[in-house]
Amino acid sequence: MSIKSDKWMRRMVEQYGMIEPYEPGQVRYDAAGHKIVSYGTSSYGYDVRCADEFKIFTNVHSTVVDPKNFDEKSFVDIKSDVCIIPPNSFALARTVEYFRIPRSILTVCLGKSTYARCGIIVNVTPLEPEWEGHVTLEFSNTTPLPAKIYANEGVAQMLFFESDEICETSYRDRGGKYQGQRGVTLPRT
């Protein structure tokens, strides 16, 4: 299994629309010239952006968090350029980018150091072969203070690994429950 390069990513975008929208370089400044958390293509990865749709966890109903029976009322929905995550809490968001993962590829997501160094952890499960959709992002605020996430700026890096052989059954083949997801997607069973 080998990691894929910037040249490979560009080719996959051109041939298969693997990442939409796609930024061929690293963007470090917004249109007004202000510094931002970078996004776009790096040597061996792609830095994704967070969209402006957030679900912030709240426990006002004092319910138990149950992945098999998740209560949608546990979240407050906001649409904003920033998201303030309460201390020791979390928020869900989605990528700006829509992904179409090739059958021979497994994609792993890692948080950006800019956020990690502030106690904000990004968690995403692997993107499996032939999965497609917006990626749902989970941000954990591990600090005792409110934490800020910026929409339309870099939040995590996707790494693409190619297998030595094609998988027998892809995510699409088995009818994965998150196939084609758009927007922030809550747990499904």
UniProtKB/Swiss-Prot annotation:
Pfam families: DCD. Pathway: Pyrimidine metabolism; dUMP biosynthesis; dUMP from dCTP (dUTP route): step 1/2. SUPFAM superfamilies: dUTPase-like. CDD domains: trimeric_dUTPase. GO terms for biological process: dUMP biosynthetic process; dUTP biosynthetic process; nucleobase-containing small molecule interconversion. It is an enzyme of class 3 (hydrolase). The active site is at E138. Keywords: Hydrolase, Nucleotide metabolism, Nucleotide-binding. Belongs to the dCTP deaminase family. This is dCTP deaminase. The lineage of its organism: Bacteria, Pseudomonadati, Pseudomonadota, Gammaproteobacteria, Cellvibrionales. The gene is dcd.
